[in-house]
Every structure is written in C-alpha cells, then in structure tokens.
Amino acid sequence: MSTAIAQQKIRIRLKAFDRRMLDLSCDKIIETADNTAATAIGPIPLPTKRKIYCVLRSPHVDKDSREHFETRTHRRIIDIYNPSAKTIDALMKLDLPSGVDIEVKL
C-alpha cells in the first residue's frame, strides 16, 4: 500500500501579444520562486493562437482589393511546487508589465 504525499502547486498561465515581454515576465516569476526556495517548472510554451482579420482596402467599391492583419497570442505555463507563504507574498508584490495577462490557480 503506497501513500502519495500531496504536493501543493501553483499554476501560472501567462498570455501576451509580445513574445519578448512574455519571456521577461516568465524569467522574473521563476527567479522569484527560486529565491524563496520553491521549485519552479517551466516556462512551458503552449501553442500560439493566430487571429487573422480581413479588411477591404477601398472605402467604396473594388472588393478584390483586401488587406490582412493578424494578432498572435503567445502563451506559457509555469508550475511552482511546494510554495511557502514567503513565495506567495513575493509573487503578489512582483511588478510585471501591463501587456501580460496572468492567471493564477492554487
């Protein structure tokens, strides 16, 4: 009969349009977790979402002339195992760029 020890885990999902800003945010989170003696796994890259918008170039006629625009949403996951109260406080005080969307699950 084996007993598994339940580990606490924080899962952080990050989304951004700019890949460089996303990677810098991931580095800050991992550095904070390492400084507080928690184990950080990641960043794990998830598939990039591409959204393409098609717009008519002319304001009146000429439907054959169109222009395409796209937005790319880059995503990452970071798992932090065995977080202490110090780890959670440090993550809450972390200053990250406004262009990065963060979801935290405990």
UniProtKB/Swiss-Prot annotation:
GO terms for biological process: translation. Disulfide bonds: none annotated. GO terms for cellular component: ribonucleoprotein complex; ribosome. The keyword Iron does not apply. InterPro entries: Ribosomal_uS10, Ribosomal_uS10_dom, Ribosomal_uS10_dom_sf. One of its GO terms (molecular function) is structural constituent of ribosome. SUPFAM superfamilies: Ribosomal protein S10. Keywords: Ribonucleoprotein, Ribosomal protein. Part of the 30S ribosomal subunit. Involved in the binding of tRNA to the ribosomes. Belongs to the universal ribosomal protein uS10 family. This is Small ribosomal subunit protein uS10. The gene is rpsJ.
